[in-house]
Amino acid sequence: MSGSDQIALVDSTYKRLENIYAMRIIAGHAHGRRLKAPRGLLTRPTSARARESIFSRLAVRMDLDGVRVLDIFAGSGSLGIESLSRGAAHVTFVDSSRDAAAAIRANLSQLELSDRARIVVSEVHRALGELGRSHDSFDLVFVDAPFKDDMSADVLVLLGEFNLVALGGWVVVEQSKRAPAAPPAPEAHERAFVATIGDHRIAFYRRPVAAPSAE
């Protein structure tokens, strides 16, 4: 096989993989629009089935209109951008990969959503520390750590430590269903329920609204 044939084969293989992992917005004003995934196979996009299940469960528990969202290990940004399409006011995307940040930036630009988003290119522990020191608070947090390097439990601890979840806010943690168990809830939070969707285990956590003080 000639060098040009090898290049053509690589390009066609990449395009097939790109089609396999092609993602579209499920609902909202950007319904049906396609999202670009970061080049390469290190990023595992959340499947459409899993995203639809996540947002269906959230829809009966919270109103996305006007909420502030934190998308950790954002990858292509599909969860955060789906939130924007459904009415979220602002999303902060966190990922250490510059390729992921470039894909998120391109997706936001093509959907004209850049003014409602911030992209933090940083290792997650450092990023959450900086958000905590700036007193950021979020109504909805997505944690989609790589299955082979599952840092979900550590991230949940940091969310509680830095007080990043607003009262009444939700945290959604996506793991492999083969992971030992859903992580325990961080301090001042509760694990509401866990769902299995295909190869994914999705755990939902909530920070309860403080009880009113007695007069």
Regions found by a protein language model. Give the residues of each.
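Class I S-adenosyl-L-methionine-dependent methyltransferase catalytic core
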Residues: 2-215
